Amino acid sequence: MSLFRRGETWYASFTLPNGKRFKQSLGTKDKRQATELHDKLKAEAWRVSKLGETPDMTFEGACVRWLEEKAHKKSLDDDKSRIGFWLQHFAGMQLKDITETKIYSAIQKITNRRHEENWKLMDEACRKNGKQPPVFKPKPAAVATKATHLSFIKALLRAAEREWKMLDKAPIIKVPQPKNKRIRWLEPHEAKRLIDECQEPLKSVVEFALSTGLRRSNIINLEWQQIDMQRKVAWIHPEQSKSNHAIGVALNDTACRVLKKQIGNHHKWVFVYKESSTKPDGTKSPVVRKMRYDANTAWRAALKRAGIEDFRFHDLRHTWASWLVQAGVPISVLQEMGGWESIEMVRRYAHLAPNHLTEHARQIDSIFGTSVPNMSHSKNKEGTNNT
């Protein structure tokens, strides 16, 4: 029998019906269990070769293969998070047994993970201080969250069918398309009010975001070696950008002023905390430390004090883009400044500056044969007649 051991783990090694050699760890230290797995694998290989059956694959096996083949993905951590959710429902299940009904049933149970994490921190803090922790109430996940999880399992099962030949037919999964929400942006006076309500270092981060349009992760992870103050430029490396392309950032005077205030705070990171804080477990954090891009407590407090609602940090990027478009910056230039991969992603700002369409809109005037008088002039004339 082609069964051997390396260290304490048993391995299977045998020749497949097509003449190829099969060798695989059986993942067990027990010889009897290893023998059973060996015989099962050998029998399955014979059925696949002689009877044309599709080999069985567990959901865990598919996930492991996916992670191995997609190891280069920048968003691999996102895939791992989605795998974690689906494993709660399909662990130990054969791919062929995963149906559309089971998938849709599982996705309805997904909840807002950030909401749960925040509650756990609150619960831990309350218990430590001898207080009664709040009752946890699950918060439904957003449509966009459900869509990304469905897109992942759809891609995984398609790969199992089309690439790995481990599935006869993948389930047909319809992914909901989140509605395009309006672009949320601030008027200059609102932005100034928000900045005034922010405390350092958040204040500098917000100012820098409004002056450069950079994403929060790019700002928080910005290093001094990525900045040339003399040339007034900064750059985001390809592996740091969403589009996987390097982004050159032209630094205006506002951005340079913000950067100069950060000089001397840290040898590596541009934006850092300079005061110690108490962690949920009661320990103290270092006085000078890198900022967290997912810390929202100070941000939410500043929004509340400024009286600004329905506004995310990423909307600062929308605000920056909206201001530039309204100032006459061409869409193509904005695309390059913001590092967007396609022009389609920038067109959502085009409606904010329709001035280039005015000449075309005037073609209707020729149909009526008359020009419309200036509205302000008409109002003045009416006021004179009434007098």
Curated annotation (Swiss-Prot):
Coiled coil: none annotated. GO terms for molecular function: DNA binding; hydrolase activity; transferase activity. PANTHER family: PHAGE INTEGRASE-RELATED, PROPHAGE INTEGRASE INTD-RELATED. Keywords: DNA integration, DNA recombination, DNA-binding, Hydrolase, Transferase, Viral genome integration, Virus entry into host cell. Residues 57-161 form the Core-binding (CB) domain. Residues 181-362 form the Tyr recombinase domain. This is Integrase. InterPro entries: CB, DNA_brk_join_enz, Integrase-like_cat_sf, Integrase_catalytic, Integrase_recombinase_N, Tyrosine_recombinase_XerCD. Its EC number is 2.7.7.-, 3.1.-.-. The active site is at R215, K242, H314, R317, W340, Y349 (o-(3'-phospho-dna)-tyrosine intermediate). Belongs to the 'phage' integrase family. The keyword Transferase applies. It comes from the Viruses. Integrase is necessary for integration of the phage into the host genome by site-specific recombination. In conjunction with excisionase, integrase is also necessary for excision of the prophage from the host genome. GO terms for biological process: DNA integration; DNA recombination; establishment of integrated proviral latency; symbiont entry into host cell; viral genome integration into host DNA. The keyword Zinc does not apply. It holds the Pfam family Phage_integrase. Signal peptide: none annotated.
